[in-house]
Amino acid sequence: MMEGLDDGPDFLSEEDRGLKAINVDLQSDAALQVDISDALSERDKVKFTVHTKSSLPNFKQNEFSVVRQHEEFIWLHDSFVENEDYAGYIIPPAPPRPDFDASREKLQKLGEGEGSMTKEEFTKMKQELEAEYLAIFKKTVAMHEVFLCRVAAHPILRRDLNFHVFLEYNQDLSVRGKNKKEKLEDFFKNMVKSADGVIVSGVKDVDDFFEHERTFLLEYHNRVKDASAKSDRMTRSHKSAADDYNRIGSSLYALGTQDSTDICKFFLKVSELFDKTRKIEARVSADEDLKLSDLLKYYLRESQAAKDLLYRRSRSLVDYENANKALDKARAKNKDVLQAETSQQLCCQKFEKISESAKQELIDFKTRRVAAFRKNLVELAELELKHAKGNLQLLQNCLAVLNGDT
């Protein structure tokens, strides 16, 4: 038998591929620690057990857990977005909706085609699809945990009453998903926001820092979007290669078991090479997905949240400029001057408040994303080297065995 890499546990069930796989370099704070300690999938729903440890006086207990569903996470996110007090902050992006349809469909098709496979082929494919389902499930849990950790780490958002209710209230929050009418309303709101964004984007910013950030984030968001799509194609290519190795290895194994001749022994040894190479290629795909693709997807959403912050500030700037014009007109006509002055002062205060917090938010965003990308890219490079050395070792061992038999 060939001496290759230690097969060990499957790459999707390794401990370090769990809930902490998606890294955004969060700053932890012992005063408030939130994690998802457990999760249960029930048909189309996932129930998350949110575990909290806190020494803050706002909570009745120091440690407690509640069960939450995806819709309740969305409710919490939307409550931040809709709160005018948080207009000057980057709202952590909402976690994506759990989607296991593709994995379930693959498992169903596998069951339907069981009769056309050998028992070994069916068992191997079933294990791989179940591992794929588990990986998606873990990733879903991780995305929801990252959202809560980002909120818990934020000095302002962590004080929010709705966040405390989400963490501590041990009953159902009675939150439902949006119906068709509400989704249509959201669609029109986004249309209006897009049109308004075009108007707002044409306004020259009075602060060079924000003008630079607006230009940079627009380019950055587009580049991350493009990189995310290409990263997905790359991981799919590695996964396809692993699937091809599996099919080639299975065919060679079938040929090798037909007889006990030297050529059949050769087929069996090469079949083993393809099987072990398949595992490495699958690990490469999984590592690239976790360390790069997921990170790009997260920062694609967070860069959009940063763009939304700049939109709110620009909108406030336009309102402030319009209030100044209205005040000038009121003074010229000597009519409703007090009302115009009050409106102008409120717009000025709002704009200055948003600008003050937004500047620090954007600086923190840069620090956070640079640290996250540096950490993940270094780890990915180390894993790629490890897998490349593993592949080389497998090929050398295989050649040594085959040459020794000839």
From Swiss-Prot:
Q: What is the effect of changing residue 97 to A?
A: No effect on subcellular location
Q: How is it modified after translation?
A: In vitro phosphorylated by PIM1; not affecting PIM1-dependent nuclear translocation.
For this UniProt entry, the molecular function terms from Gene Ontology, in alphabetical order, are:
dynactin binding; phosphatidylinositol binding; protein homodimerization activity; type I transforming growth factor beta receptor binding
Q: Where N-acetylmethionine occurs, residue numbers?
A: 1-2
Region feature Membrane-binding amphipathic helix, mapped onto this chain: 182-199
The source's superkingdom equals Eukaryota
Q: Which residues form a coiled coil?
A: none
- Any idea where the BAR domain is? 203-406
Q: Where is this region: Interaction with PIM1?
A: 2-179
Q: Where does a 1,2-diacyl-sn-glycero-3-phospho-(1D-myo-inositol-4,5-bisphosphate) bind?
A: 41-47, 100-106, 114-117
- For the modification Phosphoserine, the affected residues are 116, 194
Note the topology in the membrane. Peripheral membrane protein
Q: Which Pfam families match?
A: PX, Vps5
Annotated PX domain residues: 26-173
Gene Ontology terms, cellular component aspect? Answer: cytoplasm; cytosol; early endosome membrane; endosome; glutamatergic synapse; lysosome; nucleus; postsynaptic early endosome
* Disulfide bond keyword on record: no
Which cellular compartments is it found in? Early endosome; Early endosome membrane; Cytoplasmic vesicle; Cytoplasm
What outcome is documented for mutating residue 68 to A in this protein? Reduces interaction with SNX1. Abolishes location at endosome membranes
The domain-related comment in the record is: The PX domain mediates interaction with membranes enriched in phosphatidylinositol 3,4-bisphosphate and/or phosphatidylinositol 4,5-bisphosphate.
The record's function comment reads: Involved in several stages of intracellular trafficking. Interacts with membranes phosphatidylinositol 3,4-bisphosphate and/or phosphatidylinositol 4,5-bisphosphate. Acts in part as component of the retromer membrane-deforming SNX-BAR subcomplex. The SNX-BAR retromer mediates retrograde transport of cargo proteins from endosomes to the trans-Golgi network (TGN) and is involved in endosome-to-plasma membrane transport for cargo protein recycling. The SNX-BAR subcomplex functions to deform the donor membrane into a tubular profile called endosome-to-TGN transport carrier (ETC).
Mind telling me which PANTHER family this protein's record contains? Answer: SORTING NEXIN FAMILY MEMBER, SORTING NEXIN-6
> What is said about its interaction partners and assembly?
Forms heterodimers with BAR domain-containing sorting nexins SNX1 and SNX2. The heterodimers are proposed to self-assemble into helical arrays on the membrane to stabilize and expand local membrane curvature underlying endosomal tubule formation.
The UniProt entry's sequence similarity note says: Belongs to the sorting nexin family.
| Record protein name field | Sorting nexin-6
What is the organism field in this record? Homo sapiens (Human)
